[in-house]
């Protein structure tokens, strides 16, 4: 913390720094000094650690050196990118005054604030991932949640009651920056997120939020958006919008509306399901061998981002799904023609966001122009389709011939990175600019003529005319001939072997050229800003076009994937159940070297719960996951890896597949397993698809079997959910005899001596035996251990069979029975009523010895 008592002891420049820093106490301040951005005090220490840069010292504060660190201005974007990825925010303070005319420190001002959730610069963004800013609110009515993608203007809200539901939503949206009220009671829910920002309660005030939102959208109320009753979510949305306005410090015309996400509109998946199905991230945290890695060959970044949104929010609206199916079928014929043109569109969505924020760079406008140039070819290909949905997309894409012509006239073919570099506006666009440029560009001819004239007039063969950034134009003569220069040559600089002079004629020309360069750059900047004014009135149509182009890219990509990977169009049915013929796992079939064995799946009202048995490594988990992934693909409108698929109504997908210790939360494997199981039993419905893999294996045999049995009963009898229930408890294979709608299936395998061949083929009925020893042998367990295990297995099986035979009528299922103790046998044969007190005492000692 900076001591205000010592403020007057600082230099004027440091006083200026301290005033600016006081306005931004919680974030890093990049303070421009010449060619560097400097940081001081705790900011310097933090930046030195995070960026691995040198920590130095400058001046003194209360007798102690001031810590300082700095980064060069030309490389600032790289350092900002690193800080943003670490969840840090940075205030950028620039010199806005002229050092030449400033009395005291040059005037400085914070011109932008870079935060993880509000960045729009392409160098700071992951191009194929959404960059979401979020806000969360909680009170006794539930949770309100709002997300905004500043790079597209997509603004969404939702409301939830249960903690599990908001946890799943946070997992799905994965915001890079999260705003929460200072009174928030569920910190455990959000503590693992980067970019947490604690905000005062008044920023979540409901009336202020409504006022802010109406002001942003130019509306009197929020009824038209269907969000006026969502008071919890509106509190979060109001805080979020205010935060963006504070950081961007400019209008936000690309944020034109807000939508309410309702749970009944999508197939709900909790955090565990998203993780287990490896949609966009595998269990190791990378993107390899995920569903997205197989499906996403989109040619535009905005298409790739849209596809990932679809995967994480499958829709239940039949009309939307059938529109997509119809479009994919059409694009199988014309999609390959479209993709080369779509490839040239680039990331139009994010270019438009930068245009809206008036931060678009010259190359952004060139990219926009290039995108417009592709539209006639895209329309020509789409004209050949008679699909109503393709026609609707074509209408939304539109044409921007006038804007294309404007940018072709205004911007050079290959513009520089920044407008301050000049040379952005094309020749012929503005006559005044052309005149000033001609004056500046004519300098080289004039200087050549002056050099020839002066050299001949004075007879000095070493004379030459030049320019440098410090001293401007000069006439240079060697030291040996310097005594021959005329009196009107005024010395400007002395070098080791030469003298440099200025003459009135050259000075006059210098003033004119420098004026012309400054003037032409000023005109260019004004014309560039004017281009924004000409483009921004079309922002709404441009955003609609970008969204339609992104969707066209997704659909063309899914058409190519369907054609290449042999996917078929699933039938969406109102009848409960899932019927799949020749189903395949979309990811596993791509990474396997040998052919993938396809399998059927049949779930219906009469066949609700499948008990799946078979060897470890036999393919149970793959089979279960493939059922969920095929269902999910059908609910994003995609074709699916199968010979035939009929998919009935599905409201949720649950998975209880595999588990590991959650050490961070202090939960064991079994606790994780039971928490996920409890979530399923509380929230699954008759229309849910439930995958349960090896329930109860994390505890003792009796406990585990009892829990697995009770869970299966509950799912089959009470919930009646469509369930795939894999188990190693063979006792559960008797359930079909006791419960309606329960069926046994198994994954086949064939044993050859000590080896095993997995057939990966699903068959009706229970597995005939376990293959644990064969799998152990395959894993390399020593031969003598396998041999001993085989002997022990025979002993245990004979004991188990004997116990089963002698207790045929007992309801308890036979497990691995232990040999009866001699003490137990003695007690069974003992008649306590015939014993004297002394004999009873002797028997106690005798039984103790037996034990």
Curated annotation (Swiss-Prot):
Question: Which Pfam families did the record assign?
Answer: MutS_I, MutS_II, MutS_III, MutS_IV, MutS_V
Q: Which residues bind ATP per the record? A: 614-621
Q: Which UniProt keywords apply?
A: ATP-binding, DNA damage, DNA repair, DNA-binding, Nucleotide-binding
Query: CDD domains from the entry?
Result: ABC_MutS1
What the entry lists under Gene3D superfamilies is as follows: 1.10.1420.10, 6.10.140.430, DNA repair protein MutS, domain I, MutS, connector domain, P-loop containing nucleotide triphosphate hydrolases
GO molecular function, a single term: ATP binding
Q: Which GO terms describe its cellular component?
A: cytosol
SUPFAM superfamilies found in the cross-reference section: DNA repair protein MutS, domain I (SSF55271), DNA repair protein MutS, domain II (SSF53150), DNA repair protein MutS, domain III (SSF48334), P-loop containing nucleoside triphosphate hydrolases (SSF52540)
Q: What biological-process terms (Gene Ontology) are attached? A: mismatch repair
Protein family according to the UniProt entry: Belongs to the DNA mismatch repair MutS family.
Report the function annotation for this chain. This protein is involved in the repair of mismatches in DNA. It is possible that it carries out the mismatch recognition step. This protein has a weak ATPase activity.
Q: What is this protein called?
A: DNA mismatch repair protein MutS
Q: Which gene encodes it?
A: mutS
């Amino acid at each position: 913390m900076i001591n205000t008592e010592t403020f007057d002891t600082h230099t004027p420049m440091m006083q200026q720094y301290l005033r600016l820093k006081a306005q931004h106490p919680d974030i890093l301040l990049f303070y421009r000094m010449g060619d560097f951005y400097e940081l001081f005090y705790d900011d310097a220490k933090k930046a030195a650690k995070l960026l691995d840069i040198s920590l130095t010292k400058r001046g003194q504060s209360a007798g102690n050196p001031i810590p300082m660190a700095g980064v060069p201005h030309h490389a600032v974007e790289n350092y900002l990118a690193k800080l943003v990825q670490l969840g840090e925010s940075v205030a950028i303070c620039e010199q806005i005054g002229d050092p030449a005319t400033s009395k005291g420190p040059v005037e400085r001002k914070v011109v932008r604030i870079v935060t993880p959730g509000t960045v729009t610069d392409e160098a700071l963004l992951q191009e194929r991932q959404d960059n979401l800013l979020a806000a969360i609110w909680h009170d006794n009515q539930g949770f309100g949640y709002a997300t905004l993608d500043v790079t597209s203007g997509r603004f969404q809200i939702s409301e939830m009651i249960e903690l599990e539901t908001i946890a799943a939503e946070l997992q799905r949206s994965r915001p890079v920056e999260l705003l929460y009220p200072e009174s928030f009671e569920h910190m455990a829910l959000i503590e693992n997120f980067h970019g947490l920002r604690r905000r005062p309660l008044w920023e979540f005030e409901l009336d202020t939020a409504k006022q802010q939102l109406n002001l942003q959208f130019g509306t009197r109320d929020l009824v038209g958006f269907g969000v006026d009753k969502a008071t919890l979510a509106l509190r979060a949305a109001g805080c979020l919008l205010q935060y963006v306005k504070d950081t961007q410090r400019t209008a936000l015309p690309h944020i034109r509306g807000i939508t309410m996400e309702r749970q009944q509109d999508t197939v709900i998946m909790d955090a565990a399901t998203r993780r287990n199905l490896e949609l966009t991230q595998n269990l190791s945290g990378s993107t390899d061998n995920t569903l997205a890695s197989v499906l996403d060959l989109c040619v535009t970044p905005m298409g790739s981002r849209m596809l990932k949104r679809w995967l994480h929010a499958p829709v239940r609206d039949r009309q939307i799904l059938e529109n997509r199916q119809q479009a994919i079928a059409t694009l199988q014929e014309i999609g390959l023609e479209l993709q080369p043109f779509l490839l040239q569109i680039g990331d139009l969505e994010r270019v438009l966001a930068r245009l809206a924020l008036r931060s678009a760079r010259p190359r952004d406008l060139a990219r926009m122009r290039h995108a417009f140039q592709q539209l006639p070819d895209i329309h020509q290909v789409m004209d050949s389709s008679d699909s109503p949905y393709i026609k609707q997309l074509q209408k939304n894409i539109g044409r921007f011939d006038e804007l294309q012509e404007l940018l072709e006239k205004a911007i050079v073919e290959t513009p520089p990175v920044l407008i301050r570099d000049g040379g952005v506006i094309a020749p012929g666009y503005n006559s005044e600019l052309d005149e000033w440029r001609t004056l500046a560009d004519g300098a080289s001819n004039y200087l050549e003529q002056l050099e020839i004239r002066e050299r001949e007039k004075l007879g000095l063969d070493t004379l030459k005319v030049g320019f440098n950034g410090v001293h401007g134009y000069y006439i240079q003569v060697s030291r040996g001939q310097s005594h021959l220069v005329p009196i009107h040559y005024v010395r400007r600089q002395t070098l080791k072997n030469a003298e440099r002079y200025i003459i009135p004629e050259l000075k006059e020309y210098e003033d004119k050229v420098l004026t012309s360069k400054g003037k032409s750059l000023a005109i260019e900047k004004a014309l560039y800003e004017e281009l924004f004014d000409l483009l921004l009135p079309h922002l709404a149509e441009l955003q609609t076009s970008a969204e339609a182009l992104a969707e066209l890219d997704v659909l063309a990509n899914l058409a190519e994937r369907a054609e290449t990977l042999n996917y078929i169009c699933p039938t969406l049915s109102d009848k409960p159940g899932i019927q799949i013929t020749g189903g395949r796992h979309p990811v596993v079939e791509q990474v396997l070297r040998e052919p993938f064995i396809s399998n059927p799946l049949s779930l219906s009202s009469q066949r609700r719960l499948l008990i799946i048995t078979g060897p470890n490594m036999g393919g149970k988990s793959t089979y279960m996951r493939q059922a969920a992934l095929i269902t999910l693909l059908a609910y994003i409108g995609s074709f699916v890896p199968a010979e035939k698929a009929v998919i009935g109504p599905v409201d949720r997908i649950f998975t209880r597949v595999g588990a590991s210790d959650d050490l961070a939360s202090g939960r064991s494997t079994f606790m994780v397993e039971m928490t996920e199981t409890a979530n399923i039993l509380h929230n699954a419905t008759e229309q849910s698809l439930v995958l349960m893999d090896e329930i109860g294996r994390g505890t003792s045999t009796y406990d585990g079997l009892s829990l697995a049995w009770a869970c299966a009963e509950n799912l089959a009898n009470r919930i009646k959910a469509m369930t795939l229930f894999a188990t190693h408890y063979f006792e559960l294979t008797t359930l079909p005899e006791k419960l309606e709608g329960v069926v046994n299936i198994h994954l086949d395998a064939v044993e050859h001596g000590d080896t095993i061949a997995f057939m990966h083929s699903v068959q009706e009925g229970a597995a005939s035996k376990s293959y644990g020893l064969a799998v152990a042998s395959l894993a390399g367990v020593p031969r003598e251990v396998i041999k001993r295990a085989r002997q022990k297995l025979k002993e245990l099986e004979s004991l188990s069979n004997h116990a089963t035979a002698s207790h045929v009528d007992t309801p308890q299922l036979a497990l691995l029975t232990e040999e009866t103790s001699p003490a137990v046998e003695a007690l069974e044969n003992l008649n306590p009523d015939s014993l004297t007190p002394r004999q009873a005492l002797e028997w106690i000692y005798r039984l103790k010895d037996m034990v």
